[in-house]
Amino acid sequence: MKVNHAEIVISAVSKKQYPEDQLPEIALAGRSNVGKSSFINRLINRKNLARTSSKPGKTQTLNFYRINESFYFVDVPGYGYAKVSKKEREKWGRMMEEYFQTRDTLRAVVLVTDLRHDPTQDDIQMYDFIKYFDLPVIIIGTKLDKITKNKRQKHINRAKQVLEMDETDLFIPFSAEIGEGKDEAWSALSRYIKR
């Protein structure tokens, strides 16, 4: 997909702040600092629409990015960052649950994981959380370029096994650095962003 227009519209903390234009939405979930912002930036060929951070736990809101006036990427708070207080984690949990449960324009969730390592307990919990709400999920295994070619399939198989992925869910190996997996990601997303 060629992206001609991309902008951050709002950083929301509750549903009364969500955009009201009824465009389809794709949520992006993943551990803090796993590469969600880099994933967005690579897909849309922009260096810094989604701000990348060296500080984990920086995204504390639902960030709505309108793409081509036709759909939204919604970056949800990263999880698994130990220095965030329990109270703060609970607040994020409620915010995400409200979004996943009540948002009828939410079409699918992209779960971003680090392909170099086994999915964490938090990744498994998030995958199960998404499935609980009966939402389509696409797993993006980032940092593909950091794994030697002869070990990639082993890492992919292991990630699928640890997550106990449904066969109907897609797993796409991806590199924000070199763009590998970008076409496959757009192809997977395109079925959910048509109105």
From Swiss-Prot:
Cofactor annotation: Mg(2+)
GO BP, sorted A to Z: division septum assembly
Residue positions binding GTP: 30-37, 57-61, 75-78, 142-145, 174-176
Domain EngB-type G residues, every copy: 22-195
UniProt cross-references to InterPro entries, sorted A to Z: G_ENGB_dom (IPR030393), GTP-bd (IPR006073), GTP-bd_ribosome_bio_YsxC (IPR019987), P-loop_NTPase (IPR027417), Small_GTP-bd (IPR005225)
Presence of keyword Magnesium: yes
Residues given in the record as Mg(2+) binding sites: 37, 59
Cellular component aspect of the GO annotation: cytosol
Alphabetical UniProt keywords: Cell cycle, Cell division, GTP-binding, Magnesium, Metal-binding, Nucleotide-binding, Septation
A GO term, aspect molecular function: GTP binding
SUPFAM superfamilies given in the database record: P-loop containing nucleoside triphosphate hydrolases
Pfam families documented for this protein: MMR_HSR1
Reported function: Necessary for normal cell division and for the maintenance of normal septation.
Family assignment from sequence similarity: Belongs to the TRAFAC class TrmE-Era-EngA-EngB-Septin-like GTPase superfamily. EngB GTPase family.
Descriptive protein name: Probable GTP-binding protein EngB
Organism: Oceanobacillus iheyensis (strain DSM 14371 / CIP 107618 / JCM 11309 / KCTC 3954 / HTE831)
